[in-house]
């Protein structure tokens, strides 16, 4: 009888260990798969302006502008950008930062917008995108230091520079994260963010649920751990809200009312997170989907940005 009980316990433990091993193997496979989707370079940019868009003419105009290619090295990565000088000489420059799985070419309508408002425009490829080096996407965690490096680059070339940071989607969260860094040069005067997320953890948990119907545990936890192992950061560390709590720069926050990719609720969290006393403005564009506020209401978008820029980087 004793022997039978011992044998049964052994079989149960063997089955349990086998089940756990299978589950761990499945989770490991899923972790590597979703890490590849979320955090590994993909050279097929999404989000180009369609020919049917009311802003397609801006892309065509931008294509005809004289532009130079600028490069710098940060963290041993060579980074690439377009520089478009203003029609009339000015010390004022806007750094335009693209979003997830995009490159600088996707931002041409915004480059043209700021050019028409009279600013020099610098449009970098993020690390891991376009003509910049890097194999990984860091959701703003490392990218914020690249943006700071570009701001320093402009300031070194022209110590009289007055710089604005503009970002779209992941680029929006990137410029928000840069806002409170001590290494950000004083030449940076203000920030405009369009449809940025609160932090990478919130956004990836949201996407896992919305796109794949997957709960946060255990998969998002393990993908975040994979990010820590490969890139040195957990998803919670790429946080716009934490940065905004220390931000002293005037900021304009923009979001579409029908954004289901970065939910509209996140702009209100970001707005509330801005340090007390810091000038802040909010524009929620009615009926605009993710990263479509400019195309949905071009006049309102242009007027709001123009007024903000005239106030904080004239």
What kind of region is each of these model predictions?
Residues 110, 240, 249, 263-272:
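Short alpha-helix in the alpha/beta-hydrolase fold that links the catalytic acid
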Residues 288-298:
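Catalytic histidine-centered segment of alpha/beta-hydrolase-like enzymes
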Residues 12, 16, 21-73:
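An N-terminal hydrophobic leader/cap segment in hydrolases
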Residues 137-158:
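Alpha/beta-hydrolase active-site loop
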Residues 177-233:
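Hydrolase active-site cap/lid region
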Residues 296-314:
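Catalytic active-site module of serine/aspartate enzymes centered on a nucleophile-bearing elbow/loop
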Residues 111-133:
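Conserved alpha/beta-hydrolase
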Residues 246-248, 253-255, 259:
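Short beta-strand/loop motif that positions the catalytic acidic residue
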């Amino acid at each position: 009888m004793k022997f039978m009980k011992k044998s049964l316990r052994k079989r149960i433990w063997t089955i349990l260990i086998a089940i756990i091993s299978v589950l761990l193997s499945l989770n490991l496979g899923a972790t590597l798969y979703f890490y590849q989707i979320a955090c590994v370079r993909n050279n097929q940019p999404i989000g180009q302006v369609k020919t049917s868009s009311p802003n397609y003419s801006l892309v065509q105009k931008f294509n005809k502008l004289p532009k130079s290619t600028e490069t710098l090295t940060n963290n041993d990565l060579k980074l690439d950008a377009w520089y478009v000088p203003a029609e009339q000489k000015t010390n004022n420059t806007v750094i335009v930062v693209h979003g997830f799985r995009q490159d600088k070419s996707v931002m041409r309508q915004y480059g043209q917008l700021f050019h028409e408002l009279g600013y020099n425009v610098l449009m970098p490829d993020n690390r891991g995108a376009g003509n910049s080096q890097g194999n990984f996407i860091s959701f703003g965690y490392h990218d914020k230091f690249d943006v700071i490096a570009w701001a320093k680059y402009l300031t070194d070339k022209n110590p009289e520079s007055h710089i604005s940071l503009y970002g779209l989607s992941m680029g929006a969260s990137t410029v928000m994260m840069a806002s409170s860094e001590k290494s950000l040069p004083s030449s940076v005067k203000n920030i405009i963010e369009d449809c940025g997320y609160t932090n990478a953890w919130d956004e990836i948990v949201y996407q896992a649920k919305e796109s794949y119907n997957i709960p946060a545990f255990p998969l998002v936890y393990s993908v975040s751990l994979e990010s820590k192992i490969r890139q040195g950061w957990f998803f919670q560390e790429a946080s716009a809200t934490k940065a905004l709590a220390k931000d002293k720069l005037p900021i304009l926050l923009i979001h579409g009312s029908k954004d289901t990719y970065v939910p509209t609720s996140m702009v209100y969290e970001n707005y509330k997170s801005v340090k007390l006393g810091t000038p802040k403005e909010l524009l929620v564009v009615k009926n605009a989907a993710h990263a479509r506020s400019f195309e949905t209401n071009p006049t309102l978008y242009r007027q709001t940005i123009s007024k903000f820029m005239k106030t904080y980087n004239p």
